Amino acid sequence: SRKIRTDKVRKIRQNLFYTGDLNPQGKQTENISRDLSGYWQERGSNNLAGRILTADIDWGNNLIYCASDGGNIWRGSLAGEGWTSLTDYLQIRGIHFLRLIEFDETRRLLIANGDNLYYTDDEGVTLQLSNGLDFLSGWGGNYLKRVIITENKIVYLLASEGTGNWNNVGTIYKSIDHGRIFTKILTLDTNSGMSSNQSSDHYDIWTSRYFDGFIYLLHNDEFYRITDADELEFIANIPVSGTSENILTGGMGSNYPFFYAHVGGQIYQSMNGGSSWIDRGERPQWYFNLQN
């Protein structure tokens, strides 16, 4: 099997290392950012490529930015050349959002995982933590589920936030300065009209990246939009057969936005702006995670 072959190669390499028989010609000096250098040897894998978690493309400059499973941001050309690690000094595990936005002669990369949201205006030389999200470093049940950016570059976050009694509820934060400072606009609890107090696993948000429109909110069998006044406006119920694992995605049709919602293992579709929904059947057996 592949595991047996891999273990065999590892054992051979280890023996060569300890006996001093490892060919020194196999070593080479590598210069990496922060002016660090050293002798590096390939340690594997033998037949497995690395994978990325999410990516964004700068079409104007023919660049692609990728978040690797190892926790780094990489930049290369669209031809697949010149790959450079921009954040080798900090490992950010579980990145689920990466987006380049440009404004006022600034190029800003936004990077998010479940624990933090970072931004850099200098291609990763320095990373800054967004302000207003201190709760993420508190109780372990706090986490950042979703980041979306509107066509006019307003940033919204969906998070799970502790209530102080070992429970958490979904909350939505908003930034009007391109991700530098966030303000809470909604707590998704019974005071906001929700049927119960639940974590962000029972919610998701979506908006069009390329067209001006609303922020849409999925909550189990309920579908809303967020108005310009940061208030919830109910649209319709969804005929779901379960709850939890809420995932919402969509696009812009010729007359209305269309949506696909994943709730409790089933997939639902709306082609008329969320006014009515049909059950499209059970999801595939397994899927990676939100960004896939």
Where are these regions (language model features)?
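Extracellular glycan-interacting surfaces
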Residues: S1-N292
